[in-house]
């Protein structure tokens, strides 16, 4: 059973109680994929925060993997790589997708939500995010690591 979680709240509140945020969703899972970082604003607190998050997930799930950020950010990437190495989990770089592919939507493009329903991009903020092709590339990078 896949349980997608949006933990953008954690990215902006790096010292929040992880258990109350994700505990029931990750407990006993075979796999946790940590895919975050772009919304982090406090880069200094991110390094110890991501270490705590990875450690927590490792205690609750059978396997944990983590991706880098879609948007290139060397400081965040170093913190994520450090957490992966410290806790012995796989690190999956994905910033190359943004550099190598035209994978950002434009206003007026049609994308699909998690239920497969189409919607038209109308807001400027969404154009910095990966489009459906970019999301597919991210998913493929994760899946390739899991094989």
For each feature predicted by the language model, list its residue ranges.
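Active-site segments of SGNH/GDSL-like serine hydrolases
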Residues: 33-42, 51-83, 87
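Residue-level preference for short coil/turn positions at secondary-structure junctions
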Residues: 27-28, 60, 85, 131
């Amino acid at each position: 059973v896949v349980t997608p979680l949006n933990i953008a709240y954690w990215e902006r509140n790096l010292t929040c109680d992880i258990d109350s945020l994700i505990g029931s969703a990750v407990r006993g899972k075979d796999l946790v994929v940590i895919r975050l970082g772009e919304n982090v604003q406090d880069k200094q607190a991110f390094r110890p925060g991501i270490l705590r998050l990875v450690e927590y997930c490792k205690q609750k799930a059978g396997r944990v993997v983590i991706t880098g950020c879609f948007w290139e950010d060397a400081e965040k990437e170093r913190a994520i790589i450090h957490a992966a190495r410290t806790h012995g989990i796989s690190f999956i770089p994905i910033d190359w997708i943004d550099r190598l592919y035209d994978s950002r939507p434009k206003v007026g493009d049609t994308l699909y939500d998690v239920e497969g329903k189409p919607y038209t991009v109308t807001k400027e903020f969404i154009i910095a995010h990966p489009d459906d092709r970019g999301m597919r590339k991210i998913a493929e990078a994760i899946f390739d690591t899991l094989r």
